[in-house]
């Protein structure tokens, strides 16, 4: 089940938080509860993706994305993700989550998030390719930033991210049709 109560807590805690600019990091703090575990008594991979929502959605509010989305009746959807799991997170571990905008192109906003365990080790990292969507399809992220009144151009896409973006262009769709 989706952690609605935890999300409500994050939205409440961040309701009057300082606005973020491009590249600023949103930090949030969480606990891995027993219902977040898999059969090996560590954070379930699928649940980790859900927990990343707890950082990403308040981040969207602090970045001004949510205001523009609601005003225009648009939505923000995850169009792709690349995940790394490196350290185990177990029951009752405290997690520090960090979220930031990396860059954008004419179709997607690239957001990265990481989870840090109580030993200050990076336990996981995810990069999202997010699309803003209106009734006519995908909206250029630059339009969002213009409406937020942030006169930013996208930072240069890092090489490590460029590799993933380029590989997605070569990936067959629909899959498993060869």
Question: Where are the regions a protein language model picked out?
Answer:
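Short amphipathic
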Residues: 23-33
